[in-house]
Design a protein with these regions (language model features):
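Short, hydrophobic/aromatic-rich segments at coil-to-beta transitions
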Residues: 30-35, 70-76, 104-111, 134-137, ...
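Short, surface-exposed beta-strand/loop "edge" segments at domain boundaries and coil↔beta transitions
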Residues: 42-49, 115-125, 144-149, 168, ...
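Short, well-structured hydrophobic secondary-structure segments
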Residues: 57-73, 89-146
Length: 215
């Protein structure tokens, strides 16, 4: 559902209880429910028109002298991400939905579900340590699947699987902050660049807020 400002707002009013039951089945008896509000802003870093041929294949033309063009180096990413602060947002959305959270052995897993246009269910799992606030793994399953690792100041590879083709991606996280506290909720902040090899790159600034909602 989209509001008058073009901001996407979830969640379907019907079927909420059945989805909660499904999340409970996934997480087990220790699941606790939170109301999760996800806000995301996306900025375009570059598109295909900025690519040049090189010995490494298609790669973005270097914007910093002396930096090799085998891919976007971290120096280039920092420069491009800083420049987007002056650019208009290319995509913005907000979700509000139920998320189940289970905690054990110093690890936390948050799971939420979304319905797609065909009526199917897409699941997103967020895995993190309750001690290490600078590392988060997000697993998406359903019509499209991927495993994404966000580690502050580090670059990680990911593959985005779709029914049509797979996309090779690189993720570079400039900011990973996590204030989640069991029983009290909290917020997860991500600021990262996502490069789709041979296509484009975007910067995403995302906040996930968890508020306890026990039933």
């Amino acid at each position: 559902m989209t509001d008058a400002d073009g901001v996407l707002r979830e969640y379907p009013e019907d079927g909420g209880s059945s989805l909660r039951e499904a999340l409970s089945d996934i997480l087990g008896a220790e699941a606790h429910f939170y109301r999760m509000t996800l806000k995301s802003k996306e900025y375009e870093l570059f598109d295909f028109s900025m690519f040049v041929e090189s010995e490494y294949g298609n790669a973005p033309e270097p914007v910093i002298p002396g930096v090799p063009e085998d891919a976007l180096g971290e120096e280039i990413l920092w420069r491009l991400m800083s420049a987007t602060k002056k650019n208009p947002v290319s995509e913005e959305y907000e979700l509000s939905l139920d998320a189940g959270v289970a905690i054990g052995d110093g690890r936390a897993t948050a799971v939420y579900a979304e319905t797609n246009d065909d009526g199917g269910i897409n699941l997103t799992e967020i895995h993190f340590s309750t001690d290490d606030t600078g590392l988060i793994t997000i697993i998406k399953s359903g019509e499209a699947e991927t495993v994404m690792t966000f580690e502050r100041g580090r670059r990680h590879r990911a593959v985005y699987h779709t029914p049509y083709m797979d996309f090779d991606m690189r993720l570079f996280a400039a900011r990973v902050e996590n204030t989640f506290t069991p029983g009290f909720g909290g917020e997860i902040h991500l600021d990262y660049a996502l490069e789709i090899r041979g296509a484009a790159a975007h910067r995403t600034v995302m906040t996930m807020k968890f508020e306890p909602e026990e039933i």
